[in-house]
Each structure stands twice: as C-alpha cells, then as structure tokens.
C-alpha cells in the first residue's frame, strides 16, 4: 500500500509541509489501515474510549464511584519503564555518557526501520499534535506523536495540551519534536486483537541532535506516552543544555505563609520517594497553606529579573497508585475521585471500583492486575502491580495553584534534592552555596524502587533524580548546572536543600512522621531564605537542631527528631568511597567544581575525627 491509497492521509487539517511529509513517510513504512489526525475533542475521546472498551483494553468502572473512569490491565511483561532498552543515540558516544545506553544512530535507525516496516498493519495510525507547557508561552515546545495505540491517544489528551490548538500553533513551518511510537503488533486480515498489544522486542530511542524519539514494542506509559519522560526530560534536557535552561525531574510546590507570602519550591526525588505527596502537601502548621503547580517535571528558565522561573510542562498526573490513600495524600484521592481517570494495573472490586495496596478498606474479594480472582490475606502476591498508575487531569486537583498554567512560570525560591535513605542523610541540610548544592544533587543516592527495572532496596546514585532521564553526558549535565549558577546573580538563585524523610532508627522505625508534617521542615527552609532561622554548621552543610524546627503540636519523641537530624561523621566517612566510586563511573567529564566540593567534604570530615 502506498501513502496515496491509505485513507485519511489526504484530509490533514494542516498545511505544515514538514509534518505532512513525515506522516506520509511513516505511513508508507508502517502500513496502517487508515490515518487519523486527532483534534483532542470530547467527542473524539468518547469514541476512542468506547473502542477501547469494545477491544477489552478498558473496563468501565462504577459510574457513581469513579465517573467516566476506566481500568486497563497490561500484558504482564509490559509494566514499567525499560531502562535496559532505552537509548540515547547521539552522534558521538561520549555525548551519551556512561549513564545511558548508546548505539550509533545510523545503526539504530536501520534496526528500528526494519521493526517499523508493516508494524501498524491492521491498525489505525494516529497523528497526535501536542504542546508541553502552556500554548501561550514565548517559546512553546511542540511535538507530534504518531502512534497505533488508542490507549496512548486518550492518555496523551490527559497528560499534554493535545489536539488542534497545538497543531495550529505549529503554523505551516514551526519546529516540532518528532515522536514515533508503534506497539509492534500488526494484525493480519481477520486476526483477533488482544486487550494489551505489545511486542517482546522493545526499544525506546532518543536522537538528541535531531530532537526525535522512536519507541517500539511497549504500550506502557513511560515508554509510550512520548511527551512524558522521553520529551519532557531526555530530549528537553538536551534542548536546555543548548539553550541555557534546566529541564528537571521535579515537583513544583507553592507554600503560603501566615503573612500570605507565597514561596515556590522545586524538588527532585527519584520515583516513589514521595514527590506527588509533597506536591499535594497539606501543611499541619497553623496558618500555612500549600498549592500544587506540578508533581513530576519542572522546566526552569531565567526571567527578566534574573530569577529562575519554573513551568510544569504537563497537563495531568501519571501517579503511582500503591501507597496513595486518604491519609498519605488526600488531595490525590480527591483528584482521582473527581473521575475522568484511567487506572492501569490496579485491582478491581466486585462493585466496579478500584483498589490497591495501601488504600483504606480491604475487600474480601478482588480481581487482581493480572485479571485473576484474588482473596486478600490468602496470598503474598500483590493485588495491584507495585508500579500501577492513575492518569488524571491536573485541573481536578483541589489544591491547584492559579499560576499552574502561567506561561511565564513561577519564581523558584528553593530547590530540594531528596532520596530514600535509611541512614546517614539528615532530615534536612542546607547547601553552603550554589556549587555545593550542585554537588549535593550530583551525589544523590536512593534505594531502588519498583518504578524501574532492577533489584528493589539497593542504593543507587541518582543525580538530581535524573539518572534514567538524562539526554546527554552526566558530566556535561553537572557542568551545565554549575554554569547556570556562574552566569547568574547568586543572590537571586534558589537556595538548595537536601532532605530525607525516610531515615530509620536502630529498631527500623521511621524517625520522622513525614507527609503533612514535612511542612515543618519546609518552614525552616523558608525561614533560612528569609534569614529568620538558625542552623548549625556541619561537615555536610547547615543542619537545624530540633529547637530550630517548629514542632508545636507534634506528638513525636524528641529523641527521634534529634536522631533524624543527626550528622554522624563516621557514617559519612563510609559514604566517601561510594561517592568516589560514583565519580569514577562518571569519568573524565566530572567537573573540577564537583571534585573540589568532594575534597572539601573529605577535609571537613577529617577535622571532625
């Protein structure tokens, strides 16, 4: 079949020649039955969800409990990002760096072109125009995803500003990121489809110089919703490096003091370390309020006043379900309860609602994420997959900040780095200056979670929580962070803090209650910015004492707070060779400034001996 005979190609609602040529090229290669240009309308979404229900991909949930919401159960082999099959195919291997898989781009294009050949046969090819961040931005970042997955189209409508408005923004010659996705599951005439088509062979490939994404074989969110990690972090980080800004794996939180002064905080935590919970914080300190700007990604650019301004490029939440409940994150629950949500790989109750581990109430009987009968307490397996998700519109969040859609972004007062560490790292530490803050982010370590492949529980270095998402060499990335500070007025730069909500006592208990009580820790950070709070100088930075924190009304053992804030030089001396090992892995591109900070830390720890 030539492109001339594929229905839908001749009715494109655009005169963008570059886009039309690409669509024709992909259609000729992948051989779909038809081509559809998506418009993002309610009618289109309703039509696609009906199709997905008929195909068995979606199960309609109880309309009274979860209005206009659906459950999808994936193939058991397609449940998470596949870091082992994710590539940065820069022209030079050194530009991908040691943290990324690399292949020569010409070789990769050859392999994937062969895989794409005929891969959409029997399916519809959707052309999905989208914008990351507000459409009215000075420099809107546009993209087009071509996909053969209705699940992807529906999810992209939730997660991005998708449809005709984005297409119109491109005009006749505007630049856009090309994002090509195929499930790799062609259908022969008369062949019955499966509810979750995918392929055992998977590639998620990025070409940073040409700003292209090619994904094959997976229908799962992070591998298939190409506006998310692929564009917003991997390709955008390469763009940011070239253009002098930052594309980061960070939530954006608005904290409002009793004096009604607003502070915006960006925070980088690895997956499943409480990012969404903090983004939707409910402060427990009287008079303080919090609002949400974003829960996962922040793009930070300098404003005309010399400060860093952040936008959330996303339009929805793609959150981890297990552990989300009315106690840990009531605002996430309210967002989900409002409806219009797609759940993936959670369990289903007998009355057509959803359930996952950590949710209040334990039904006697469930259908688990594999579609099997499940009796709680009779098995050690999980009813919901540990990386099961909800995909829901950000506009439904009850604590959404009015500035969330501001094309200028919001001015960032503080940047937090944090991971999941049982020992060593105190509840909060303030960096001495910008470069010291970059060192803290560059050496961030966290225990492995279920959001990625690999052994759960082992500590891995996750610089700025960007390890799986860097679009270029990690050493160049650290230098870019240092340069961002060098080229700015440091007095206008955000203060940098290092937090750890997860420290445990010798008996294995969490020392800090976390969740809403984290507002007490953030209050200290804000007061440090305002020069109103004390802290003690330690070898690792400025750390508060228990007396420096507002603990009024908190029922917690004072000894636990002291232990959560403790800086133990002997533990940090054990950390030094692990950092050294990490730097050896980073290799020759490790910036001198980072090495200088490490040497200074060693010196300060030696003085504590």
Swiss-Prot record:
Give the chief site where it resides: cytoplasm
Subunit comment for this entry? Monomer.
Q: Where does Mn(2+) bind?
A: 229, 249, 296
What function is annotated for this protein?
Catalyzes the conversion of oxaloacetate (OAA) to phosphoenolpyruvate (PEP), the rate-limiting step in the metabolic pathway that produces glucose from lactate and other precursors derived from the citric acid cycle.
- What keywords is this UniProt entry annotated with? Cytoplasm, Decarboxylase, Gluconeogenesis, GTP-binding, Lyase, Manganese, Metal-binding, Nucleotide-binding
Q: What EC class is this?
A: lyase
What are the TM regions of this chain, as residue ranges?
Answer: none
Give the EC number(s) under which this enzyme is classified: 4.1.1.32
Q: Which organism is it from?
A: Mycobacterium sp. (strain KMS)
**Pathway(s) where this gene product acts:** Carbohydrate biosynthesis; gluconeogenesis
- Give this protein's Gene Ontology molecular function annotations: GTP binding; manganese ion binding; phosphoenolpyruvate carboxykinase (GTP) activity
Q: Binding residues for substrate, per the UniProt record? A: 81, 220-222, 271, 387-389
Family to which this protein belongs? Belongs to the phosphoenolpyruvate carboxykinase [GTP] family.
GO biological process annotation, one example? response to starvation
Name the InterPro entries on file: PEP_carboxykin_GTP_CS, PEP_carboxykinase_C, PEP_carboxykinase_GTP, PEP_carboxykinase_GTP_C, PEP_carboxykinase_GTP_N, PEP_carboxykinase_N
**Listed name of the protein:** Phosphoenolpyruvate carboxykinase [GTP]
The UniProt entry's coiled-coil ranges are none
Where located? Cytoplasm
* One protein family per Pfam: PEPCK_N
Question: Can you quote a single GO CC term?
Answer: cytosol
Q: Mind telling me which HAMAP family this protein's record contains?
A: PEPCK_GTP
Q: Give the reactions, separated by semicolons, that this protein catalyses.
A: oxaloacetate + GTP = phosphoenolpyruvate + GDP + CO2
Matching Gene3D superfamilies: 3.90.228.20, Phosphoenolpyruvate Carboxykinase, domain 1, Phosphoenolpyruvate Carboxykinase, domain 2
Q: How is the cofactor bound?
A: Binds 1 Mn(2+) ion per subunit.
UniProt: GTP binding residues: 272-277, 389, 420, 515-518
């Amino acid at each position: 079949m030539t492109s001339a005979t594929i229905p839908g190609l001749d009715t494109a609602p655009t005169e963008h020649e570059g886009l039309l040529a690409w669509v024709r090229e992909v259609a000729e290669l992948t051989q779909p039955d038809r081509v559809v240009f998506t418009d993002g309308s309610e009618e289109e979404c309703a039509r696609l969800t009906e199709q997905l229900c008929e195909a068995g991909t979606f199960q309609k949930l109880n309309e009274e409990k979860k209005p206009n919401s659906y459950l999808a159960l994936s193939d058991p082999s397609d449940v998470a990002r596949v870091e082992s099959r994710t590539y940065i195919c820069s022209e030079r291997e050194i530009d991908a760096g040691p943290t990324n898989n690399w292949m020569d781009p010409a070789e990769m294009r050859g392999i994937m072109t062969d895989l794409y050949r005929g891969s959409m046969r029997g399916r519809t090819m959707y052309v999905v125009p989208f914008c990351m961040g507000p459409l009215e931005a000075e420099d809107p970042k546009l993209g087009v995803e071509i996909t053969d997955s209705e699940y992807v189209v529906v999810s992209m409508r939730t997660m991005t500003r998708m449809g005709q408005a984005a297409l119109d923004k491109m005009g006749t010659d505007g630049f856009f990121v090309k994002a090509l996705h195929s499930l790799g599951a062609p259908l022969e005439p008369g062949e019955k489809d499966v509810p979750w088509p995918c392929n055992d062979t998977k590639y998620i490939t990025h070409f940073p110089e040409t700003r292209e994404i090619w994904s094959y074989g997976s229908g799962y969110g992070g591998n298939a919703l190409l506006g998310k990690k692929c564009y917003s972090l991997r390709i955008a980080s390469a763009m940011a490096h070239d253009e002098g800004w930052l594309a980061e794996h960070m939530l954006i939180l608005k904290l409002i003091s009793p004096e009604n002064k607003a502070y915006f905080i960006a925070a980088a935590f690895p997956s499943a370390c409480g990012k969404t919970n903090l983004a939707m914080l409910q402060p427990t300190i009287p008079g303080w309020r919090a609002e949400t700007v974003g829960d996962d990604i922040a793009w930070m650019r300098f404003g005309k006043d010399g400060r860093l301004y952040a936008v959330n490029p996303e339009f929805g939440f793609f959150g981890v379900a297990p552990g989300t409940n009315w106690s840990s994150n009531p605002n996430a629950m309210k967002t989900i309860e409002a409806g219009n949500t797609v759940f993936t790989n959670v369990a289903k109750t007998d009355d057509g609602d959803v359930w996952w581990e950590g949710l209040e109430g334990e039904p006697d009987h469930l259908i688990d994420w594999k579609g099997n009968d499940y009796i709680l307490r009779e098995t050690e397996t999980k009813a919901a997959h540990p990386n099961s998700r909800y995909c829901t519109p950000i506009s439904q969040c009850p604590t959404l900040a009015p500035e969330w859609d501001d094309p200028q972004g919001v001015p960032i007062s503080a940047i937090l780095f944090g991971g999941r560490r049982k020992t060593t790292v105190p509840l909060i530490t303030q960096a001495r200056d910008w470069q010291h803050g970059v060192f803290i982010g560059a050496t961030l370590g966290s225990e492995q979670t279920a959001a990625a492949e690999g052994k759960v529980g082992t500590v891995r270095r996750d610089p700025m929580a960007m390890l799986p998402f860097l679009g270029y060499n990690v050493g160049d990335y650290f230098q870019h962070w240092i340069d961002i500070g060098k080229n700015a007025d440091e007095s206008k730069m955000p203060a940098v803090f290092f937090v750890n909500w997860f420290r445990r006592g010798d008996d294995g208990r969490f020392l800090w209650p976390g969740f809403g009580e984290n507002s007490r820790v953030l209050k200290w950070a804000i007061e440090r910015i305002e020069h109103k709070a004390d802290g003690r100088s330690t070898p690792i930075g400025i750390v508060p004492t228990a007396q420096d924190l507002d603990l009024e009304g908190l029922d917690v053992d004072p000894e636990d707070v002291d232990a959560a804030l403790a800086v133990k030089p002997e533990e940090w001396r054990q950390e030094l060779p692990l950092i050294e090992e990490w730097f050896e892995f980073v290799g020759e591109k490790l910036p001198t400034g980072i090495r200088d900070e490490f040497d200074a830390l060693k010196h300060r720890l030696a003085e504590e001996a």
